[in-house]
């Protein structure tokens, strides 16, 4: 068996990635989220495949086909709610995974980090298009508002929006192409994940100290396979509690009303995982400025290696930057809350303050804190 594992051209790739992979001996539970994201992706692809067997991407029947899945298909209600809440679990794991990367300075593995940012954009695009498919009120108006943002691009904006819509408004052509893209993107994401892992295995994993761990490596199997399995059990437990007891808690009641172009919902808002970016978008009165801020809120992650001023990699032994980091986390929670609130006083000013704070902490305060910590170290 050992000979096959190490010699077979296909199995040896799996062996070098998941079995004999040298891993740091001290990586904590924060390193479990990679495998959990892999699990989420598998769940989403499988449930999505079964949903696609019964779904029809036509404006006249899309809403009814989702109702048919929930009422008439064997365990269709379970598949539908697993897919909808699976997206939420996916984003929870994604945010924690990125947050771990920022905290422990994993962004210094530049290729892996940039691939991760591409993956984040791909997953966000997939989730957005998936939200349009049930063709409820929030699906329709969310698609209208978000795609309409592209009209802020000078000269070609309006033409670009109509090209994406396939007409002069969000309609049958839009729904059909969104379904096609929503179906193909997860497979593209799977390919990108393999590239992400390829880059990761070039350098090896980071660890909680931020120090080089080449002198102290252990095999991935059985130590981290069993550890990942515990994470999988906890995730599945939380996932099934969410899906079976509170299936609609993260959804919007407006999406149980069929799409109606003549009736605008009182508050148009995206799913909870986009609310922080939506709050940043809304906090700038200018349309183009808002769109740029929205894009920059994610793209700014790519600049983190350039903004790293400290002599140490991780925040483990850096209390000043740690404080900045947790203020940033709190700020993101505030932005998420604001994104779901109506555009009125005092929410507007809170959103604007939180948006400025978000960029200021990343671009100004965290690099400054790093330099101050360097000076404190030099005093010794």
Curated annotation (Swiss-Prot):
One of its GO terms (cellular component) is respiratory chain complex III. GO terms for biological process: mitochondrial electron transport, ubiquinol to cytochrome c. GO terms for molecular function: metal ion binding; ubiquinol-cytochrome-c reductase activity. Its cofactor is heme b. Heme b b566 binds at residues 97, 196. It is a multi-pass membrane protein. It holds the Pfam family Cytochrom_B_C. It is found in: Mitochondrion inner membrane. Keywords: Electron transport, Heme, Iron, Membrane, Metal-binding, Mitochondrion, Mitochondrion inner membrane, Respiratory chain, Transmembrane, Transmembrane helix, Transport, Ubiquinone. The keyword Cell membrane does not apply. Component of the ubiquinol-cytochrome c reductase complex (complex III or cytochrome b-c1 complex) that is part of the mitochondrial respiratory chain. The b-c1 complex mediates electron transfer from ubiquinol to cytochrome c. Contributes to the generation of a proton gradient across the mitochondrial membrane that is then used for ATP synthesis. Heme 1 (or BL or b562) is low-potential and absorbs at about 562 nm, and heme 2 (or BH or b566) is high-potential and absorbs at about 566 nm. Belongs to the cytochrome b family. The cytochrome bc1 complex contains 11 subunits: 3 respiratory subunits (MT-CYB, CYC1 and UQCRFS1), 2 core proteins (UQCRC1 and UQCRC2) and 6 low-molecular weight proteins (UQCRH/QCR6, UQCRB/QCR7, UQCRQ/QCR8, UQCR10/QCR9, UQCR11/QCR10 and a cleavage product of UQCRFS1). This cytochrome bc1 complex then forms a dimer. This is Cytochrome b. The lineage of its organism: Eukaryota, Metazoa, Chordata, Craniata, Vertebrata. The gene is MT-CYB.
